Structure formats: structure tokens, C-alpha cells
């Protein structure tokens, strides 16, 4: 099968070439209090 990965390439991969990135939370879920406030404001 030609679609199998080249294990030699994986074994010789240098992790030092990877760049270190800082991950940031982008879409945080709202708290229960925030959801309740929004529900109350929609009703009134």
C-alpha cells in the first residue's frame, strides 16, 4: 500500500525543529450565571 507513512522519516524526525507556541483560550464557555442573566434579559 502506498498510503502508509514512511516509518524511516518518522524515526528520523527532529523535534528540535518544531517551534514553541503559546496557546491562548479564544472561545471560553460562559458561566452558568452569565447564561441565566441572558435568559432573564431575553424574557423581560
UniProtKB/Swiss-Prot annotation:
In terms of one coarse class, where is the protein primarily found?
Answer: cytoplasm
Composition bias, kind Basic and acidic residues: at what positions?
Answer: 1-25, 33-44
Task: One Pfam family, please name it.
Answer: Thymosin
Do you know which InterPro entries this protein is assigned to? Answer: Beta-thymosin, Beta-thymosin_sf
What biological process terms from GO does the record include? Answer: actin cytoskeleton organization; actin filament organization; regulation of cell migration; spermatid development
For this record, an example GO cellular component is:
cytoplasm
Residues with PTM Phosphothreonine: 21, 23, 34
Q: Which GO terms describe its molecular function?
A: actin monomer binding
PROSITE patterns (alphabetical)? THYMOSIN_B4
Localization annotation: Cytoplasm, Cytoskeleton
Query: Residue positions of the PTM N6-acetyllysine?
Result: 4, 15, 39
Q: Which residues carry this modification: Phosphoserine?
A: 12, 41
Residues covered by region (Disordered): 1-44
Q: Which UniProt keywords are present, listed alphabetically?
A: Acetylation, Actin-binding, Cytoplasm, Cytoskeleton, Phosphoprotein
**N-acetylalanine PTM sites in chain numbering:** 2
Q: What role is this protein assigned?
A: Plays an important role in the organization of the cytoskeleton. Binds to and sequesters actin monomers (G actin) and therefore inhibits actin polymerization.
Per the record, the similarity remark reads: Belongs to the thymosin beta family.
Would you tell me the protein name for this molecule?
A: Thymosin beta-10
Amino acid at each position: 500500500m502506498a498510503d502508509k507513512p514512511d516509518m524511516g522519516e518518522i524515526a528520523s524526525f527532529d523535534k528540535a525543529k518544531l517551534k514553541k507556541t503559546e496557546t491562548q483560550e479564544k472561545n471560553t464557555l460562559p458561566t452558568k450565571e452569565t447564561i441565566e442573566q441572558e435568559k432573564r434579559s431575553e424574557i423581560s
